[in-house]
Curated annotation (Swiss-Prot):
Belongs to the GlnD family. It catalyses: [protein-PII]-L-tyrosine + UTP = [protein-PII]-uridylyl-L-tyrosine + diphosphate; [protein-PII]-uridylyl-L-tyrosine + H2O = [protein-PII]-L-tyrosine + UMP + H(+). GO terms for biological process: nitrogen fixation; regulation of nitrogen utilization. This is Bifunctional uridylyltransferase/uridylyl-removing enzyme. GO terms for molecular function: [protein-PII] uridylyltransferase activity; phosphoric diester hydrolase activity. Residues 499-622 form the HD domain. The keyword Magnesium applies. Uridylyltransferase (UTase) activity is inhibited by glutamine, while glutamine activates uridylyl-removing (UR) activity. InterPro entries: ACT-like_dom_sf, ACT_dom, HD/PDEase_dom, HD_domain, NT_sf, PII_UdlTrfase/GS_AdlTrfase, Polymerase_NTP_transf_dom, UTase/UR. The lineage of its organism: Bacteria, Pseudomonadati, Pseudomonadota, Alphaproteobacteria, Hyphomicrobiales. Has four distinct domains: an N-terminal nucleotidyltransferase (NT) domain responsible for UTase activity, a central HD domain that encodes UR activity, and two C-terminal ACT domains that seem to have a role in glutamine sensing. Residues 384-739 are annotated as: Uridylyl-removing.
Amino acid sequence: MDSVTTEHKQEVDDRFDTARITAAVDALAEKHQGREDAFRTAMAQLLKAELIAARAAAQAILLKDRHGRRCAERLCHVQDEIIRILYSAATRHLYRSPIPSGAERMAVVATGGYGRGLMAPESDIDLLFILPYKQTAWGEQVAEAILYCLWDMGLKVGHATRSVDESIRQARGDMTIRTAILETRFLTGDQPLYDELVERFDKEVVQGTASEFVTAKLAEREERHRRGGQSRYLVEPNVKDGKGALRDLHTLFWIAKYVYRVRDTDELVERGVFDAQEYRTFRRCADFLWSVRCNLHFYSGRAEERLSFDLQREIAVRLGYTSHPGMQDVERFMKHYFLVAKEVGNLTAILCAKLEDQQAKPAPVLSRMMARLRPTPAKRRVPDSDDFIVDNNRINVAAPDVFKHDPVNLIRIFRLAQKHNLAFHPDAMRDVTRSLGLINAQLRENPEANRLFMEILTSDNAEIVLRRMNETGVLGHFIRAFGKIVSMMQFNMYHHYTVDEHLIRCVGFLQDIERGGIEEFAVASDLMRKIRPEHRSVIYIATLLHDVAKGRPEDHSIAGAKVARRLCPRLGFSPADTELVAWLIEEHLTMSTVAQSRDLSDRKTIENFAAVVQSVEQMKLLTILTTADIRGVGPGVWNGWKAQLLRSLYYETEPVLTGGFSEVDRGKRLTAAYAEFRNAFAEWPADELDAYIARHYPAYWLKVELPRKIRHARFVRSSEQAGHKLAINVGFDEVRGVTELTIFAADHPWLLSIIAGACASAGANIVDAQIYTTTDGRALDTISISREYDRDEDEGRRATRIGEMIEDVLEGKLRLPEVVARRTVRSKARPFVIEPEVTINNQWSDRYTVIEVSGLDRPGLLYELTTAISKLNLNIASAHVATFGERARDVFYVTDLLGAQINAPTRQSAIKSALTHVMAGDKAVQPAA
């Protein structure tokens, strides 16, 4: 075990009195002599009580010293002693060995994570019972006695019984068994038997197979990352198996142990794998991750490995994090977590470089293929520079001092790799990280360094290169504002990645937009081709910086604009372009907000938006930035509906900005929409097509994407042919994780409230709604609800129940308030706190009062809101329903019962108060009978 174990072993021993407990077990054996079952039960009860007490003591110490590795060592030591006590009891009181024949020998060995000498509170125990030959009755009885007692104590135990020969044979053919034996640790029994296994394993399995083992372990690591999500910046990480988590550290040590034959981690420095600083980083990362994992297990009471939102805040408090202006305690904790994950990745790269030097790890597949196809020298100078070489198709330094003699090389290396399509040699990245101190004010102001950086940002594969710059620390040191958001998470369910990862991904999506050919980016790609050439760099830097001021007390859009005004002149931007970048950052949320939460058929909405964007060129740039930003939030956030909303907002606003001129005017867009719809239904009679097109208002044809229009038309036609007064169609969106209910019914003032109430009574949470009324007074509403079941069949049955309830309410068979009161169950406490906000505005529309509510989402919220609005004697003309993770943002265009705006301050105040109470969940609001 490591030196830390030795250092704290006395402290552990003082808290677990093995001699006292052994004496108590002996007393139980004497008391229950001749009654084996009674003895086993009493012994299990005694040891379970001692284990509970020891765990409680370990948790108390952990909360005090916050040293996770020591806690894991304490827990492991306690478990070791319990197994030794059990072995002693089994061999002295239950199954005494007959006259030793040589066969009645056994070594009890810890394997897996337990073999490392570290245990989380709820971890499994892995044991190997080693026998000299085949299984004997005595060996089977002893192993069973130990195992049954452990199971009676409520422990999860993995076990195997093998001879030395069997262990060696299986280790040769099974990499999992090989890894388990690699980590064995002797507990009790026959030490020479264990020593024989270790010696033979080293000679017969390990020797000459280093490359095979390394390749297998790195492949396992890649597959594990692929299954869990490739990014180490996913905001609910798995502390055991996630990227940059404990399993990566374990893999690193397995490889080092196998290749360098080390037993303890401190030997990694002696063998030259790490220098002293890197070893300290290794220990610091391990201790932090063990602290998190042990606290997770203790707090949850189970083997919980995922840092889910509902656990993050509690773990942050247990680890002593506090809130700072602009950053919550939980956000500071998670930033630390992701910084550690990044360092784990760096350590893995360092080990891989060392292994390649010693040929234990094969060169990357691409490099081997290139070598076969192009038999050039393995190392050559990089074109355009004498300071770097190409080593196996990867860029490396030509001399140890290339960064010291010219610090611009810290930027140049990334540009050269990008320009010549080279991978990065781990040694070069190690040298870069060690040279970060050279990135000072002088280098930041260096024109050549800034020119190279802008070339990196605006050239192919910018996302890949920027990510490497970020992982090495160069990006955060060169642009210090970016350094402040490295590994920063936002404590919400909307953003899937840390802020820095989100920004880098957005740049990648911007490049996808520029390349074109992707249908979901069609509008943005078209606009990208039409912006002024000098504004190409503007949109790239704005995309990289739009969230750079997150985590500050000030609004991040305003603070980010200030960052841009300071930074852009240094990067070579003119005053006018600097101001344009600042404007884009300050307004980067505006277009998304207007498109998703305003009535785009209302002239005032368009005029207000036009006043913000000021020019067609600025609107083009803002549309492109908005598209990349939404797409970069995470999977399922961007969809065809949002793309169509942005398209509609853009083309509705263009004539206002140009005095009536539009590259694609409204009439032409309507004609094109009709034409593509007709093409999709060429088999329909012409008069039926004309009649269907006439049933929808222009806003429908301009705002709804074609695939949805096609589904609507088929659904409406089949419903009417079947004579249904009310029809419901069910669809599933796997990417967004929602079930879509499309309702076709006679329009009704309470229809939205009825739909929302039916969903609430079924426990279905509405995440967005698309609401349309036809010219002949029919409602065509699509409601998206969060999935509850994995199987589509189960989701379909739930949707059918909702539809039947809507029909029963409309026909007067059910009173919705009673159904909702009977069936709606308040959702469990959520980890998020969002202050409810209600805004009432008469400037966003000339005809309607616009009510915007925002707060913590929950099942039944839309029903409560629409019911409250109806009780306030307001008519809902249109509703715009959306959720952003855990935040609901619903906008209602309303009038009073006479069709007028709400102007009286006292009336507005009453509306605001009532809806604030609803958002806060103060009381259930019931509709009028």
